[in-house]
């Protein structure tokens, strides 16, 4: 532990299960923690004498200076996540007992929101890669509501690819912003939501977009029960240009590489027009 980056004690405030093996963890910190939307923090979990660190992108807005929210997928045989699903560990994290403790270090990362860029933003996430985008969206929405007269009009296209619809984390929150955009055409922060699933045979109730996150950029005439998202998908795919859009990518390395290759064919340049954050298990 360095003097520059000391660990901050944290207590588990809540654990909300979005789906089996997919949960939201909120930690209360003993002192303020400042960060930029898109950055990550390292969670240090100590249990029965063993300490394990693991970096996680921050979901919460920077305005919550003493709370950190993480969107975590249970990785079987993972270094840390299996412990977060054990009842004795959770109980210890809530009560801060002698055997169990959580600490935070950071923030770190350059995958951050660029408020100086006036272009519309496309957030492409696979799985829990949605986490940093939720921090960005929440922060932008707070600024939009606080000082609408000073807010630069912009549109955010949120593309989220998962295997099954039950894994579309934060879906109600994003859908609410998209619905408000539809009701208020003059809304300065306009949000479009494009969720897509890759295993529809095992999700028969789904009537939305199909395919992995990268498929959102493919041209298609395929209809889907009148779902307007197919029209939006086609419009986004055809209108996407580096002059008007900056694309942020987060999640599975394969998804990021595939989308990057497609965008480069359209004239997008890495770092300038494409921001990337790869997740590794």
Where do the model's predicted regions map?
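Conserved beta-strand elements of the Class I
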Residues: 121-124, 248
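Active-site catalytic microenvironments for nucleophilic, acid-base chemistry
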Residues: 44, 139-143, 262, 266
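Short, low-complexity N-terminal leaders and the immediately following helix N-cap/first helix
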Residues: 1-20
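Ser/Thr-glycine-rich phosphate-binding loops at phosphate-binding pockets of nucleotides
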Residues: 126-132
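Short, flexible hinge/linker loops that cap or flank conserved catalytic cores
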Residues: 62, 114-117, 150-152, 239-241
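Histidine-anchored nucleotide/phosphate-binding helix
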Residues: 58, 134-149
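Reductase modules of NAD(P)H-dependent flavoproteins
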Residues: 2-8, 159-281
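FAD-binding FR-type
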Residues: 11-13, 24-122, 278-281
């Amino acid at each position: 532990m360095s003097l520059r980056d000391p660990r901050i004690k944290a207590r588990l405030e809540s654990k909300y299960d979005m789906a089996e093996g997919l949960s939201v963890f909120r930690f209360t910190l003993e002192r303020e923690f400042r960060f930029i939307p898109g950055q990550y923090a390292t969670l240090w979990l100590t249990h029965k004498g063993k300490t394990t660190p693991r970096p996680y992108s921050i979901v919460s807005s920077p305005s919550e200076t003493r709370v950190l929210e993480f969107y975590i997928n249970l990785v079987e045989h993972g270094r840390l996540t299996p412990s977060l699903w054990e009842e004795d560990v959770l109980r210890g994290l809530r009560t801060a007992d002698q055997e169990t403790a959580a600490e935070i270090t950071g923030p770190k990362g350059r995958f951050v929101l660029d408020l100086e860029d006036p272009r519309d933003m496309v957030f492409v996430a696979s799985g829990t890669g949605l986490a940093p985008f939720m921090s960005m969206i929440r922060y932008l929405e707070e600024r939009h509501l606080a000082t609408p007269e000073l807010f630069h009009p912009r549109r955010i296209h949120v593309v989220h690819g998962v295997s099954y619809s039950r894994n579309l984390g934060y879906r109600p929150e994003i859908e609410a912003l998209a619905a408000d955009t539809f009701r208020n055409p003059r809304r300065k922060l306009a949000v479009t939501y494009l969720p897509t699933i890759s295993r529809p045979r095992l999700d028969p109730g789904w009537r939305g977009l199909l395919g992995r996150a990268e498929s959102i950029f493919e041209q298609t005439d395929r209809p889907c029960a009148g779902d307007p998202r197919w029209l939006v998908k086609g419009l986004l795919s055809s209108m996407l240009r580096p002059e008007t859009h900056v694309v942020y990518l987060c999640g599975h390395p394969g998804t990021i590489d595939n989308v990057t290759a497609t965008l480069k064919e359209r004239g997008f340049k890495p770092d300038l027009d494409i921001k990337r954050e790869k997740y590794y298990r």
